[in-house]
Design a protein with these regions (language model features):
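Conserved MFS/SLC helix-loop-helix module at the cytosolic interface between two early adjacent transmembrane helices
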Residues: 78-117
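Cytoplasmic helix-loop-helix junction between adjacent transmembrane helices
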Residues: 121-159
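Helix-loop junctions at membrane interfaces in 12-TM secondary transporters
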Residues: 111-122, 178-180
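Central cavity-lining transmembrane alpha-helices of secondary-active solute carriers
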Residues: 70-85, 138
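Helix-loop-helix hairpin linking two adjacent transmembrane segments in secondary transporters
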Residues: 150, 157-201
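Extracytoplasmic gate region of multi-pass secondary transporters
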Residues: 48-50, 230-261
Length: 261
């Protein structure tokens, strides 16, 4: 009888990979909640690019001033850091709720803008909350799910933001035909308020934040703390990748409908 080859023995002795831990009912609910909230984040963030030609015509803007408007609103993407920073002090639950309610309210106010100045201001503040929601949703996903499931959860939530942008591009041509025109695109953004009213009671603080809330060693939550950790190089590498990616793609995405269609 032939003896087993070393390779077959090695394969036989190798432990089978463990199945990922099943998600709890709360984790499944949280997965759905974060996905829906981030879907509307993607929808609202992409709305300006979709309505820009109509907005220019309605408010009498030339392409140069339209570009300045987009740049001004995009400053909110940077200012979102100061909202996300509060999550380390006030808690993830409180800040996530604030960001969702914030971007909903300012998207609604955008629909009632009377001139380009009020539109620009509403969009700047809305983007602070939009990017804040996205960042805190990622924190929730990182802290509330086991390592074996974390990549899948984060990937699906991020995909929902892209799906929101795709849906925005699909429905905008129809919404522009309504009596409200481009304003109706932002009126749709009030839907998250209904979600918050129904679902907020089930949202919990993350276990990690609750555990570390009274820990003296974890109270240094300043930005400078990153410079004193082993991960500082990785943080700046990822920041550079994101900055270069957006630098290359943002203009193309924002002005695609203006010049390519």
């Amino acid at each position: 009888m032939p003896s087993p080859s070393p390779s077959s023995s090695a394969r036989g002795d190798a432990p089978l990979p463990e199945r990922p831990e099943a998600l709890t009912s709360y984790q499944r609910w949280l997965f759905f909640f974060l996905s829906v909230a981030t879907f509307f984040e993607g929808y609202d963030l992409f709305a300006l690019a979709q309505i820009l030609p109509n907005l220019r015509a309605d408010m009498g803007l030339d392409p140069v001033y339209a570009g300045m408007l987009v740049s001004f609103a995009s400053v909110g993407n940077v200012l979102a850091y100061f909202v996300v920073d509060r999550a380390d002090r006030w808690g993830r639950k409180r800040v996530l709720t604030i960001t969702i309610v914030g971007y909903t309210i300012f998207s609604l106010l955008t629909a009632f803008s009377t001139n380009v100045w009020t539109f620009a201001l509403c969009q700047l503040v809305a983007r602070i909350f939009l990017l804040g929601e996205y960042a805190v949703a990622m924190v929730y996903a990182a802290e509330e799910y086991p390592a074996a499931r974390r990549g899948m959860v984060i990937g699906v939530i991020q995909a929902c933001a892209s799906l929101g942008a795709i849906v925005c591009a699909i429905v905008v041509p129809f919404l522009l035909q309504t009596p409200w025109g481009w304003r109706s695109v932002y009126l749709v953004g009030t839907v998250p308020l209904v979600i918050i009213a129904i679902a907020r009671r089930n949202l919990r603080e993350t276990e990690r934040f609750s555990r570390e809330a009274g820990d003296e060693a974890s109270r240094d939550r300043s930005f400078g703390r990153i410079l004193r950790t082993p991960y500082r190089a990785r943080v700046f590498q990822l920041a550079a990748i994101w900055a270069l990616t957006l630098f290359c793609t943002q203009n193309a995405v924002t002005f695609w409908k203006e010049f390519a269609i």
